[in-house]
Amino acid sequence: MPQTMKALVKAKSEVGIWMEDVPIPTIKPNEVLIKVHKTSICGTDMHIYKWDPWAQANVPVPMVTGHEYGGEVVEIGSTVRRVQVGQRVSGEGHVVGNVSRNARSGRWHLDPDTKGIGVNLPGAFAEYVRLPEFNVIPLPDDLPMDIAAILDPLGNAVHTALTFDLVGEDILITGAGPIGIMSAAVAAKAGARRIVITDINNWRLNFAKKIVPGIHTVDVTKESLKDAMKSVGIQEGFDVGFEMSGAEPAFEQMIDTMIMGGNIAMLGLPSKPFPLDVGKVVLKALTMRGIYGRQMYDTWYKMLAMIDSGLDLEDIITHRFESQQYQEAFDVMLGGECGKVILNWND
């Protein structure tokens, strides 16, 4: 094995990302080394690329970025027992400390001592990535590597969508990005009655129709959400909301159109704090729950089972590039008219 590898590095405290030669990671006894085959670009990667205030506050420079990937185990540490060389895998990107009350109670996704692959720890936009055995997700032999590369964001969608009962319920999704659209597909498979998704980007709304047959789309710059709700036969309000946008107007519209006693799962992160009309939440007896990442590891089991039973998300991938074409891939992401964008790290 060579001593160095190609990797996309946040090498400077400015806009951009750079392909560099860096040392291949050396694994610890409890870690595995994964040969990366495919990666996908995430919204977090775009924050790092644009070097916005969040990235400046959270990402040390230099840092190998990326955390959505599929690959193959090529080396295991001396204490690794469950994972084998040659196994096809993906990985949970949140590396936890395992000593907090939440972690020791099995709520690992709520461990306050959490570090992110590609954010605080060297990431997967590289030929190789190292990962604790605890975080490794073995994959079925017939799962395409392109799909393996989008399991991380699909997990966010599954965690959000399955927070509340969906069978026979009317669902409102605010934000038609890839995770919002994937959450719609999950809700449809889980038995939701009507699904309405909103955005201000018409391309995204049309894309949602392609991915999720029967979904109702609303461009809130042109159509009232309340009127759209009534036009599809929802009389009293939405039963369950998935807030995926982090946008204040979208959140306000969601609260206004929820049924009395409705449930809201919130994944979208606002770019800055905004006020909340708590009176409406109280008087409508709404239940709201914040969603962070994926439940470790129930979400992974559920999404792999849903894929095995027919959840088809192949078309959510709209662009594929070789790793050397990374700038083209990031430019596509910046353009805003795409689903998931894949980078191929195979020779």
Identify the residue ranges that each predicted region occupies.
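Short SAM/SAH-binding signature in class I
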Residues: 236-242
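NAD(P)H dinucleotide-binding glycine-rich loop of Rossmann-like/cofactor-binding domains
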Residues: 95-174
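Residues at the starts of beta-strands that form the adenosine-phosphate
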Residues: 6, 170, 193-194, 263, ...
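Glycine-rich phosphate-binding loop and adjacent beta-alpha segment
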Residues: 210, 247-309, 345-347
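Short amphipathic alpha-helix with an adjacent loop that forms part of the alpha/beta core around
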Residues: 224-235
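Mid-domain Rossmann-like dinucleotide-binding core that forms the NAD(H)/NADP(H) cofactor-binding site
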Residues: 143-222
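Glycine-rich beta-strand-centered segment in the early N-terminal region that forms part
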Residues: 25-39, 53-101, 140-142
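C-terminal hydrophobic helical "lid"/dimerization subdomain
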Residues: 1-5, 252-256, 297-347
